[in-house]
Amino acid sequence: MSLPMLQVALDNQTMASAYETTRLIAEEVDIIEVGTILCVGEGVRAVRDLKALYPHKIVLADAKIADAGKILSRMCFEANADWVTVICCADINTAKGALDVAKEFNGDVQIELTGYWTWEQAQQWRDAGIQQVVYHRSRDAQAAGVAWGEADITAIKRLSDMGFKVTVTGGLALEDLPLFKGIPIHVFIAGRSIRDAASPVEAARQFKRSIAELWG
C-alpha cells in the first residue's frame, strides 16, 4: 500500500494570506489546493500564480464545478491546474465534460462528495471513467460538532473497493489519522490544522510522520 499524499487547503480569501502559508510549508506537502474560497476571492490567477511558484507540486483548483463543466474546467487547466473538482450534485454530463477537458491537459477530475449523493451516482462516475473522489465532512458539519464516525469509515472503504482513489478531508486533525489505517487513502487534506498551527512547518511534518508510521 502506497503512502497517502498530504495536501494543504488554501481556503484563504486573498493571495497575500495564501502566500503566508505556502512560503512556510509548500515544500512539506505534496499537493497545493487553491481552495474554493480562494478561487472565488482571486479567480484562476491564484491557480496560475501558485503553479508558477511551485511547478513541481500538484496544484488543485477546488472549483466545485456544478455546471458548464467543459468551460470552467478549461479555465482552470489553462491556468495550469493539475486537478479540478466537480461537485457531486452536478449532472453526470458535467463531470464527463470536465474529464474530457482534463485529458487534453493530462490532468484529472475529482468528484467532491459534499452534501447528498448516492451509490448509484458513484457507479455512474466510475462508469464515466472518474478515478478520484473527495470524501468530505463539511465545514458547517464540523462547526456543528459532527465527528468522524463508523458510517464515514464504511463509506470510504466502499468507495475504495469500487476502485476510486479516495481523498479524505473535513477538519482533519492529527489524531484522526489512525481511524483510516488499513484503507488505501490516496490523499489527506489538512487546512486549518496546518495553516493555523503555532508552527505550520512542524504541523505538516507531524502529519507526514504519522502517515509514514501508519501506512509505511
Curated annotation (Swiss-Prot):
It comes from the Bacteria. Binds 1 Mg(2+) ion per subunit. It catalyses: 3-dehydro-L-gulonate 6-phosphate + H(+) = L-xylulose 5-phosphate + CO2. One of its GO terms (molecular function) is orotidine-5'-phosphate decarboxylase activity. Its EC number is 4.1.1.85. Mg(2+) binds at residues 33, 62. GO terms for biological process: 'de novo' pyrimidine nucleobase biosynthetic process; L-ascorbic acid catabolic process. The record marks 64, 67 as: Transition state stabilizer. Keywords: Carbohydrate metabolism, Decarboxylase, Lyase, Magnesium, Metal-binding. Pathway: Cofactor degradation; L-ascorbate degradation; D-xylulose 5-phosphate from L-ascorbate: step 2/4. It holds the Pfam family OMPdecase. Induction: Induced by L-ascorbate. Repressed by UlaR. InterPro entries: 3-keto-L-gulonate6Pdecase_UlaD, Aldolase_TIM, HPS/KGPDC, OMPdeCOase_dom, RibuloseP-bd_barrel. Its cofactor is Mg(2+). Substrate binds at residues 11, 192. PANTHER family: 3-KETO-L-GULONATE-6-PHOSPHATE DECARBOXYLASE SGBH-RELATED (PTHR35039:SF3). Homodimer. Catalyzes the decarboxylation of 3-keto-L-gulonate-6-P into L-xylulose-5-P. Is involved in the anaerobic L-ascorbate utilization. Belongs to the HPS/KGPDC family. KGPDC subfamily. This is 3-keto-L-gulonate-6-phosphate decarboxylase UlaD. It comes from Escherichia fergusonii (strain ATCC 35469 / DSM 13698 / CCUG 18766 / IAM 14443 / JCM 21226 / LMG 7866 / NBRC 102419 / NCTC 12128 / CDC 0568-73).
